[in-house]
Amino acid sequence: PEFGVPTGNFGDAFAGWAGRKIGGNIGHIHAAVNRNDALAQAINTGHYVRHQATETASVSMDVQAPSNFERLVFEASGRHAEGTKGVFDNFNATGNVHLSGDLQNALRAQVTASTISEDETAQTIKYAHDKWNKVICPHTAVAVAAALKRNDGQPIIALSTAHAAKFPEFVTKALGFAPDVPEAIWK
């Protein structure tokens, strides 16, 4: 199956890629990011620019320079250490680097990415409740929204990374009511 992965530092997505590399039954990896979308821009356009991170409801994903992205670039470059070092030395010095067309194509062959807005995140929390009677957190909603956007007919699993009770204000606003919180969450 394919996987939609909520992505901040790109660790879970890279772990999925590595699992596939060693023979795991892992299909395509689709990185789902919030409006802090430097990773998605790098994969989709080849232009990797560090911006100031902005706070979102999916706060663990508020990252503009994902630490694990360098690992994927290294692998996509054919494990070319000097080339990868050059890309990230340039990025670290300037906050801006343009990836070559070959590298960009190699990256997209490994991972695709979508940017999900705060409105889409809220709408997806409501959709998950209305359609499946599930209350999901903002991080999970970003992954579900990206999976729904992918819509290529292949089964896709959206990773869920937190409990919705950790985000009561945003989830309540999205649903229009305060969901029940399991007793175990309060302990």
Predicted region positions:
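PLP-dependent amino-acid enzyme catalytic core
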Residues: 1-187
